[in-house]
């Protein structure tokens, strides 16, 4: 069994942040579905602007909204407009892994390429 990349939103743009919320990353539900992210799933975030890497969990955002909002303590690690990578990993048996679901996004969090 191996720990492999399962889902990735590449170049997502932070649309909002809320330090006073209990935590999480709110992601447009349509984007979640495209890369197979589930509510409350653990994700690793890498901020391309400042190099920060941290973990949080996913909550659903309004479908079609383009929302990428960091909440709670994680909100202190990003700024609106930062470009981030959202990654989720899974444990797979040899032979069952077919690669990650990857969506590359533009500055409005619209999908420009699927891998």
UniProtKB/Swiss-Prot annotation:
Catalytic activity annotation: L-aspartate + H(+) = beta-alanine + CO2
GO cellular component: cytosol
Annotated cofactor note: Binds 1 pyruvoyl group covalently per subunit.
Listed cofactors: pyruvate
Descriptive protein name: Aspartate 1-decarboxylase
HAMAP family noted in UniProt: PanD
Quaternary structure and partners: Heterooctamer of four alpha and four beta subunits.
Binding residues annotated for substrate, in chain numbering: 56, 72-74
GO molecular function (one): aspartate 1-decarboxylase activity
Catalytic residues, chain numbering: 24, 57
A UniProt-annotated Pfam family: Asp_decarbox
Superkingdom of source: Bacteria
Record gene name: panD
Subcellular localization, as worded in the UniProt entry: Cytoplasm
Gene Ontology BP term (one): alanine biosynthetic process
EC number of the protein: 4.1.1.11
PTM remark: Is synthesized initially as an inactive proenzyme, which is activated by self-cleavage at a specific serine bond to produce a beta-subunit with a hydroxyl group at its C-terminus and an alpha-subunit with a pyruvoyl group at its N-terminus.
Residue(s) carrying Pyruvic acid (Ser): 24
Role: Catalyzes the pyruvoyl-dependent decarboxylation of aspartate to produce beta-alanine.
